[in-house]
């Protein structure tokens, strides 16, 4: 009897999941159709270069809702991520359709809002995660988190493991959209607009303001942090690298800034040698740096979640473990993105 009940419950849960997925897909496609019909009007608000990117997100999300989880995700973790970023993308589209934007200060948990660009006056999306323990009476750490190429702020911030670390450390996470084709080039000011908006919306600890980036974002932190070095307590580079052309600027502007450099030993997109050479350069320049390598890690952020949790905790605590024994084969910093 217990087995029959269990099977019945399992069937009911499966039916509910299928129905919820179908409903979610219908909602995404319905909003996408409304968005497409008003794309010209929306372009005057967001700028023409990214207007259709947001439309494409809705279509992609609808496909993800019906897709099986990738082999490196559990079903629950995948569903949490997909639900998270699809809800953020829906919120983005609905706000643009209504031309009414959620105040950043009102967000609790996972949310999406817009910040007006100081560069061109357009409205630019920013994903936000505010941990449940946040109180305006207690200053919180802030991480401004930069996503990778061909990704989005919503997909970067939605996974459960990001929320888990943010909850554990009490960190507010703010992820601006990198609308430049590569390396946040041309949209650097959007990062600082998001940073300024977060400092106005929340009570932020001035001694715990961090800049982090993954993949393309991991390269970009070395361009963006030197622009206003006093804004950042520490910088985290995940599956990215410092390039030789930026080394003098980093050495001059960020000599006292703590760096946390992360890599997967099996990364075949940004070879682990790149972050290794970055850590060697920073160490030899006398800049505080800690290096983390995940032996089974690839370029996927999910595969680096263990060392991300450790590095995040070290960053919050101000811990620096100067790396020893790193081998770069006598090579200097890379000059270009692989």
Task: Enumerate the language-model features and the residues they cover.
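A domain-start/cap signature at the N-terminus of enzymes
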Residues: 22-140, 320-338
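Alpha-helical scaffolding within the catalytic cores
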Residues: 155-163, 194, 240-251, 273, ...
């Amino acid at each position: 009897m217990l087995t029959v009940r269990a099977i019945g419950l399992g069937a009911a849960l499966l039916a509910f999941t299928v129905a919820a997925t179908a409903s979610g897909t219908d909602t995404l496609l319905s909003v996408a159709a409304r968005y497409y019909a008003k794309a010209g009007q929306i372009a005057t608000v967001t700028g023409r270069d990214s207007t259709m990117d947001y439309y494409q997100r809705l279509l992609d999300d609808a496909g993800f809702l019906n897709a099986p989880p990738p082999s490196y995700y559990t079903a629950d973790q995948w569903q949490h991520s997909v639900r998270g970023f699809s809800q953020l993308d829906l919120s983005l589209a609905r706000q643009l359709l209504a031309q009414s934007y959620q105040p950043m200060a009102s967000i609790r948990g996972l949310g999406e809002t817009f910040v007006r660009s100081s560069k061109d006056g357009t409205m630019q999306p920013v994903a936000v995660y505010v941990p449940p323990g946040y109180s305006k009476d207690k200053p919180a750490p802030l991480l401004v988190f930069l996503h990778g190429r061909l990704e989005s702020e919503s997909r970067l911030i939605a996974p459960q493991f990001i929320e888990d670390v943010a909850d554990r450390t009490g960190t507010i996470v703010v992820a601006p959209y990198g609308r430049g084709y590569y390396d946040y080039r041309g949209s650097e000011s959007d990062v600082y607009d998001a940073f300024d908006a977060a400092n106005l919306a929340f009570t932020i600890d001035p001694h715990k303001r961090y800049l982090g980036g993954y993949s393309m974002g991991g390269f970009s932190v070395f361009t963006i942090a030197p622009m206003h070095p006093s804004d950042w307590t520490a910088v985290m580079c995940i599956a990215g690298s410092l390039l030789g052309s930026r080394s003098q600027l980093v050495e001059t502007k960020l000599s006292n800034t703590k760096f946390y450099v992360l890599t997967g030993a099996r990364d075949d997109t940004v070879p682990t040698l790149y972050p290794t050479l970055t850590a060697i350069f920073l160490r030899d320049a006398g800049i505080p740096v800690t290096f983390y390598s995940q032996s089974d890690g690839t370029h996927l952020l999910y595969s680096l979640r263990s060392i991300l949790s450790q590095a995040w905790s070290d960053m919050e605590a101000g811990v620096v473990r100067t790396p020893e024994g790193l081998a770069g084969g006598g090579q200097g910093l890379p000059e270009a993105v692989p």
